[in-house]
Regions:
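N-terminal lobe of the biotin/lipoate ligase/transferase fold
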Residues: 1-126, 180
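Long, positively charged amphipathic alpha-helical accessory segments at protein N-termini or as interdomain linkers
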Residues: 83-130, 134-203
Length: 203
């Protein structure tokens, strides 16, 4: 379905944009610039933990997707918004930072890396709560963000997330000490995307 929508977007001249939400089974994906050595387990172990592994054409290194994580695939025409890919990534990070702020979680960006982080500058405490890996073809965006809500963080122990060996990962559940209603988070994300990019959201 995602490939079909992208194909339609690449061949359309209108200003119609798509915002896709999903929750994946256990899977590791490696971006174009990634190192295969950042997957720390064998094929046999992948089967044992019921996970799969793919090399894909997004930016970034290795990351994990799985249950309890909201993955968002915005398929936007950046030319229609008049922004660059770098500005687009900045907007995605800003949306997550605002959402976390609404839950009382202070998050920020990390210079030289994409995604949303907590406790930057605090040695031994820096951790990522949202990974971002995107690319654009003829101004149309592909891939997106992976936001840890109630994610089983044990799956991150089998990789060097996004190539970092000195930083951790976290989730909203860990930070707040309770299970989070993912439907509420999704609805907040829909509203924040609409506000940030100035469009009305139609399901």
């Amino acid at each position: 379905m995602i490939r079909k929508v992208i194909h339609q977007k690449l061949n359309a001249s209108g200003d119609l944009h798509y915002l896709l939400f999903c929750e994946h089974p256990h899977v590791y994906t490696l971006g174009k610039s990634g190192e295969g050595s950042n997957l720390l387990i064998s094929d046999e172990m992948l089967k044992r933990i019921n996970a799969t592994y793919y090399r894909i054409n997004r930016g970034g290194d290795i990351t994990y997707h799985g249950p309890g994580q909201i993955v968002v695939y915005p398929i936007f025409n950046l030319e229609a918004f008049g922004i660059t890919l770098k500005e687009y990534i900045h907007k995605l990070e800003g949306i997550i930072i605002l959402l976390l702020e609404s839950y009382g979680i202070k998050a920020t960006r990390l210079d030289g890396a994409t995604g949303v982080w907590l406790d930057i500058g605090v040695k031994g405490r820096e951790r990522k709560i949202c990974a971002i890996g995107v690319r654009a073809s003829r101004f149309v965006t592909m891939h997106g963000l992976a936001f840890n809500i109630n994610t089983d963080l044990n799956y991150f122990s089998y990789i060097n997330p996004c190539g970092f060996v000195d930083k951790g990962v976290t989730s909203m559940q860990v930070e707040m000490g309770k299970q989070i209603d993912m439907s509420i988070v999704k609805n907040k994300l829909e509203r924040l995307f609409a506000a940030e990019f100035g469009f009305s959201y139609k399901k």
